[in-house]
C-alpha cells in the first residue's frame, strides 16, 4: 500500500488533543474521517507528536497508508475539502517509502510557546497565547533557561504519569525572543530536541515565568533540575500558548513539494 506523509496545521482549541477519542473530538479522528470519505476504511494515521488538549500545530507530521496511488497535491486538496469547516489543514503531502514512520523516523521536534505579559486581556490572540497580567524580566528568564540546555535527567519537568522509559533527554535549544506588542511584551520560547517528555515544555515555561515574575531566582531552576523531583517544579502553564512548529527527519519528505 502506498504511504504518504502529511504536514498538518491545526488550532487545538476545539479538540481534546491529537489522539483519537471515543467520544470527544480529536485531530486524528477528524483526519481519519476525512480519509474515509476518500477511500473505504478503516484508516489509522500515526503522528510525530500526540499534542494535548488545546495545543496547536503549524508543522505536525503524520503518515497514512492508502489503497491507491494519489497525486500528493490532489490528496492534500481532497483532504482539506473534507476537513472543512474544522480548523485543520493539510499544508503538504508527499509519497514516502514504507520504512518512513512519522514518529519513529523523526530526529528532532520543535516547539514554540507564546507568553504575553500584558494587563489587558488578549483579544485577537485569545486562545493562542498564555497571558499574565504582570511584567516579566526577560534577562532573568534567559539566565535560568541556560541551566536546562543539554543532556539532563528531566524528572522534575515531566508529568507524573509520563510513560517515557527514561527521563533523560537532550534539550538542544531553548531560546527566548521578546516582541513589543501594544501595551505589553510577548515572550516567545523556542525549544528543540529529538523528543520531549509529557508536559516537559509547559513545565519548563511555567517555571521560567516564575523567574520572570521575580518569585524564583534564576539559580533555583538549576536546583529544581538537579532535585529530580516533580515537587520541585514550578507551575505547569496552560496549553493554549504551545505550538508544535516542526519535525525533522534525516531527509525532508516534503523537500519537493
UniProtKB/Swiss-Prot annotation:
Function according to Swiss-Prot or TrEMBL: Formation of pseudouridine at positions 38, 39 and 40 in the anticodon stem and loop of transfer RNAs.
PANTHER family: PSEUDOURIDYLATE SYNTHASE, TRNA PSEUDOURIDINE SYNTHASE-LIKE 1
GO biological process terms, semicolon-separated: tRNA pseudouridine synthesis
Enzyme class, broadest EC rank: isomerase
Classification via Pfam families: PseudoU_synth_1
UniProt similarity note: Belongs to the tRNA pseudouridine synthase TruA family.
Protein name per UniProt: tRNA pseudouridine synthase A
Source organism: Cereibacter sphaeroides (strain ATCC 17025 / ATH 2.4.3)
EC number: 5.4.99.12
Sites where the protein binds substrate: 111
One GO molecular-function entry: tRNA pseudouridine(38-40) synthase activity
Keywords noted in UniProt: Isomerase, tRNA processing
Active site: 52 (nucleophile)
InterPro entries assigned to the protein according to its UniProt record, in alphabetical order: PsdUridine_synth_cat_dom_sf, PsdUridine_synth_TruA, PsdUridine_synth_TruA_a/b_dom, PsdUridine_synth_TruA_C, TruA/RsuA/RluB/E/F_N
